[in-house]
Amino acid sequence: MAQISKYKRVVLKLSGEALAGEKGFGINPVIIKSVAEQVAEVAKMDCEIAVIVGGGNIWRGKTGSDLGMDRGTADYMGMLATVMNALALQDSLEQLDCDTRVLTSIEMKQVAEPYIRRRAIRHLEKKRIVIFAAGIGNPYFSTDTTAALRAAEVEADVILMGKNNVDGVYSADPKVNKDAVKYEHLTHIQMLQEGLQVMDSTASSFCMDNNIPLTVFSIMEEGNIKRAVMGEKIGTLITK
């Protein structure tokens, strides 16, 4: 019997660092294979899935800006880094016989389709895995904001935020403060008021304004994406 997901359509947000593993840089083949297997498992259920991958394992626009680069140029470099991650994930998924499409906000027709909202929705309706890359196509906006915007555009039920170094949202950094408390449930306004570093304030405000729930969980535990899709209580749930 096919397992039933809680959600019809989800957006999975992965940090670039999640693909790097312990080295913190580049793409770890073992990690990306594990992520692809988890995504493929969800795709076989009755759930449509879109993925957004950051580029921090290759380049961070803010880092370049802090070093004196033009912020716009640095951010565009970061967008290109997300395309590299997206293509690597697409390749891993296709090796698992998953029909996958990469849609980019910056046109590069030789390697991916340009992002068109209706096309993205159509791919999802056809049960294809969609990977959004190159951010929203504009500098100064993070991939967290991309996840929020794309989730609203494709009418996703939830954003699943897979983290590589934490299993939910805590009152403080659990690696630094042993008294940090893990939250099972939060509201968007709490997250903003308490300055909890789940996503940047632009993305948080957008999710709150558009009533988009988030589940924050560890991507490093095998099977957690499936558990999140099935609505199991893992990580932290954030709602309006």
Swiss-Prot record:
GO terms for molecular function: ATP binding; UMP kinase activity. One of its GO terms (cellular component) is cytoplasm. It comes from the Bacteria. UMP binds at residues 55, 75, 136-143. Keywords: Allosteric enzyme, ATP-binding, Cytoplasm, Kinase, Nucleotide-binding, Pyrimidine biosynthesis, Transferase. It is an enzyme of class 2 (transferase). InterPro entries: AceGlu_kinase-like_sf, Asp/Glu/Uridylate_kinase, Uridylate_kinase, Uridylate_kinase_bac. Belongs to the UMP kinase family. Its EC number is 2.7.4.22. The lineage of its organism: Bacteria, Bacillati, Bacillota, Bacilli, Bacillales. ATP binds at residues 13-16, 56, 60, 164, 170, 173. This is Uridylate kinase. GO terms for biological process: 'de novo' CTP biosynthetic process; UDP biosynthetic process. It is found in: Cytoplasm. SUPFAM superfamilies: Carbamate kinase-like. The gene is pyrH. Catalyzes the reversible phosphorylation of UMP to UDP. Transmembrane segments: none annotated. It catalyses: UMP + ATP = UDP + ADP. Pathway: Pyrimidine metabolism; CTP biosynthesis via de novo pathway; UDP from UMP (UMPK route): step 1/1. The keyword Kinase applies. PANTHER family: URIDYLATE KINASE, URIDYLATE KINASE PUMPKIN, CHLOROPLASTIC. Homohexamer. Residues 21-26 are annotated as: Involved in allosteric activation by GTP.
